[in-house]
Amino acid sequence: MLQAQDIHWSQFNDNPIFQNPANTGEFFGDTRFIGNFRDQWRSVSVPFQTFSVSVDRKAKYFNYGFLMFHDQAGDGKFRTIEATGTVSKNVKLSNDSTHSMSGGMVLGINHRQVNKDAFYFDAQYNGYIFNPLLPTNENFQTDQKTNLTLGIGTQYSLNINRRNYVKTGISLFNLTRPNQGFYQDKIRRDVRLNFQVKYCKSLNANWDLLPSLQYSKQGTYDEFMLGSSVRYYLPGSNDHYIRKALLAGVWFRAKDAQILSLGCEYKDWFVGLSYDINTSKLVPASRARGGFEIAVRYILYRFKPKRIDHRVCPDFI
C-alpha cells in the first residue's frame, strides 16, 4: 500500500491533461470540459473507483487548465484526492503552423488517507477467536498525508489538418518526491514518466484511422499500451463545427488486459466507453472481468461574426 502507484486510464487519450500538461489548450475550440469515471475489480473485491474532471482554455500568451481526481481502493478505502492547475505554451516551428512544440507544467495538492480501523491484524487474534477490541500493535504515525505535487511535459505536433496529424510527447510527474508513508519511515513517491504517440490518418471521406501508444514507468513498475480506433463520419458531418461520427477500437495493455472501446461524436460532444478484459494472472479470481470506463467531453467554441463586405440597401433608401 505504501508503494502505491499513480492512477491510470484505459482511455488515456481522453484525459489529456493527466497524460501530459503540454496538452493544455491543444484542441480545436476555445474551452474544453472533460469528465472521466473508472470502476474496476468489482468481481474480485471492493471495487476500485476513480473519477476526474478537467477544464482547459486557450489564451493569447499561455493556455491554462484545472484537473481534479478522486480515487478510492480496497477495504481500507485508501483514498487519493488531487487538485492541480496546469499552464502551457505553444510555439510555432513553421510559418504555416504545421510544425509546433508545446511545453507545460502542472502544480497542485495531493491528499492521501486510509481508514486504518477497517483492517484486521494478527495481534487481534487471541489464539481462539478474532477480537477487534484488541490493539493492533501497528504504529501508525498518521492516517493521511497532504503534499505538493509538480510535473512538467513537452509535446511535438505535426498538424496537416484536423484529420491528419501526429503528436508525440513526454512528461514527468511527482518531481517533488513527496513522503507518502503513514509510518515514521519516509516512503518517497516515485517519479512517473509518460511517453505517448498519437496519430490520425484520413483514409477517405468517411473513415479515419487513429492508432496510438503510451508507455508509463514509475519506480520498478511500467505499463505499455498500444491500439487503434477507427472513426466513421455520418452523413451531414464536416471538418469544422458539425461533426457526427462513431468510433470503435481495440487496445492492449501488456501482460494485463485487452480493451474494447466505443465512442460517439456529435457536434461539440464526445462520449467514450471502454471495458477491460483481464488477461493477467488474476484471471482465476477476476474471471476475465476488469474495469468499465466512461469519458465525456464538451468543447465550447467562440463564434465570430462573419465579415460582410457589401450590403444590399433597401429600395426606400
Spans of features found by a protein language model:
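Subset of outer-membrane beta-barrel
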Residues: 5-317
